[in-house]
Amino acid sequence: MNKNFMYGIGAVKYNDFVIGYIEKGSFDLNGQKAEAAKIEAEQAPGAPVLIIPQSNGSIAPTFNVIQTDYKNLHAMLGGTLHYAKEDTEKNNPIGWTAPQAALLMQGPFELELVSGRSILIPNGTLLSNLGGKLTLTETAKIECTLEVAMPEDGSQPYGVFDSKTLPEEWGEHKLPAAGAAAAASVQSEEATSKEG
């Protein structure tokens, strides 16, 4: 598999919960361009004299979940699961009712791609609602937007890694520190120059 490309959503994971089937063609990274203020001068027509960065580019993925079994509705929208009276162990829900208060799914998300990479988001907030058309050619769906926020420790908002070799820090739902990555890169360059 060529790892020079990122494509195909394999799974969306919240903590260790795998969110159900994603509607074909609905997943969009929804990338936002970086913003900058352009300072222009009368004496320099045609081009700015200074560009001041305002914000980095960001992502806010959107997607539709079409697997609307009761447990998935409960996990993604909140509310209450209902069980038959004889189901004392509450194994097989027979219904779901919507929540009275807003559900906040906030925490670590992993977007595992078919191409062999994963997008790791330490601090995401999933906003979702029940939507779709009830026809014989479409299904109801849970319409989702995953907002990416800065982690509490001020580290990077997201990162891309090989799915088979996720960083050790991800065990604690954190990304490697930028300084550690830079130091590893310098050490790697020094080792390469000594070999040559």
Regions found by a protein language model. Give the residues of each.
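Short acidic, glycine-rich loop/turn motifs
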Residues: 13-14, 111-115, 150
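An acidic intrinsically disordered interaction segment
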Residues: 21-31, 104-116
